[in-house]
Amino acid sequence: MYIEKIDSPKDLKSLSIEQLNVVAEEVRSGVLNRVSNHGGHVGPNLGFTEATVALHYVFNAPEDKIVFDISHQSYPHKMLTGRAKGFLDVNDMDAISGYSSPLENPEYDNFEIGHTSTSVALASGLQKARDIMGGKENV
């Protein structure tokens, strides 16, 4: 399994498109495993799996900031940022929250968010801060 060897999005950079498709399949399986055994949100996570793999392949998180519209889309992101075990191993599922959380991973989770409609304001704030600080990262 590829997903067990992914500690950060940088690990995706060397994979082929075919291998990235396998990663997406493994992520979807991990989401279903977690939700079946622990509860959580299925649709938003499954629906955004390929997009999350693509975002992490193209951009350079954590330098580039990725903001999700709803935290219910964050399971694939969590799996690609070193937290796959919380989706694959039933004994580790309590270690992962159902939402993005800087307490869980301050490097990749910029905000503690839950529901929708905060993403535009959060991304705008990150952009403004980047511009004030003279940064070059993508938001």
What are these regions (language model features)?
Residues 1-34:
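Cofactor-/ligand-binding subdomain signature composed of acidic, glycine-rich
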Residues 13, 37, 107-108:
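A short, mixed-charge helix-start or loop-turn motif at secondary-structure junctions
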Residues 33-42:
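Asp/Glu-centered strand-loop micro-motifs enriched in Gly/Pro and often flanked by an aromatic residue
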Residues 41-139:
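Cofactor-binding active-site loop characterized by glycine-rich and histidine/acidic residues
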